[in-house]
Amino acid sequence: MSQRTIFIAAAALMFAATAWAHHNMSAIYDFNDRITMTGTLSKMDWRNPHIELIVDTKNGTEVQSWALEGPSPSFFRARDINRSDVEAALNKTVTADASRARDGSRAGLLRTMTLPDGKVISACPQNC
């Protein structure tokens, strides 16, 4: 085998491993450990490869910020959910259901979110 062939094969394997690790959500989030939170949607990052939402909840007098990761914007667009739907909820109360991060941080994989107008958005390809 030539050095060029070995190099190409090694590069392909490295790329495949990186892509697999990035999309292996079960390694990052525990699908059996769910949390439901009600709080203020304080930030939204609506871009590829995954949207990110920050929900500020209260624990007594302490505010806890939760980082919730969701699918790509195109996932939501295909389900008739637009950036403007979520932007309208900024600085308002939302209820979110998420799978917790395995590392114990205040992070989760978004499953569903109820917007202030009562619209429920699902971040699951099928039933959550």
For the regions a language model picked out, list residue spans one by one:
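Short aromatic-glycine-enriched beta-strand elements
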Residues: R47-K58
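Short, basic/aromatic beta-hairpin or loop at an interaction surface
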Residues: E62-F75
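Bacterial N-terminal signal peptides that target proteins for export
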Residues: M1-I8
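OB-fold/S1-family single-stranded nucleic acid-binding modules
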Residues: S99-Q126
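Conserved hydrophobic positions within beta-strands
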Residues: G39-L41
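Short boundary/loop segments of OB/S1/cold-shock single-stranded nucleic-acid-binding domains
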Residues: A19-I35
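Short nucleic-acid-contacting surface segments enriched for D/E, G, S/T with interspersed K/R
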Residues: A78-A96
